[in-house]
Regions:
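Short, structured surface patches at the beginning of a domain
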Residues: 1-144
Length: 144
């Protein structure tokens, strides 16, 4: 008689996904855009069965430097604590309008194993060709 060991199937772990959104002013007309962005990302992440929503991080600031944005800093701390796998952001300009910050943080997140997806530009930082394109688009975002 041959005894065969049957291993239970373990489903793959869900990707821990966060979103980052930002409006550049505190004016009332921006409130609707801000709330719409948050709702959109909650629904988008929940629509992927292999994704788990961690949080939608958000800032209502026009600060160009990420060190002045508490939502961004909270997201960075979560990444450093190994609580995130993917960050989704509408565009490079929402992530950072400062070219140096954009490139440094994109590389830093990647060293932590966190992929950033910039929706409008269709860029993923886990793509090895993204650095060149990201540097050009970050420069454009800085001049906007």
């Amino acid at each position: 008689m041959i005894i065969k060991k049957v291993m239970p199937k373990i489903p793959p772990a869900k990707k821990r996904v966060a979103a980052y959104c930002r409006v550049s002013t505190l004016r009332n007309e921006q409130d609707e855009s801000f709330e719409t962005q948050q709702k959109y990302y909650e629904e988008l992440i929940q629509s992927h069965p292999d994704w788990e929503l961690v949080k939608v991080y958000a800032d209502r600031h026009s600060a160009t430097r990420v060190k002045n944005r508490p939502g961004f800093q909270e997201m960075a701390a979560a990444a450093e604590a190994k609580k995130l796998d993917i960050i989704i952001c509408k565009s490079i300009s929402r992530f950072s309008r400062n070219m140096v910050d954009c490139q440094q943080y994109a590389k830093w997140f990647r060293t932590l194993g966190v992929t950033i997806i910039f929706e409008e530009q269709n860029i993923r930082t886990d793509d090895p060709t993204c650095d060149f394109v990201l540097s050009i688009l970050a420069a454009v975002a800085q001049d906007e």
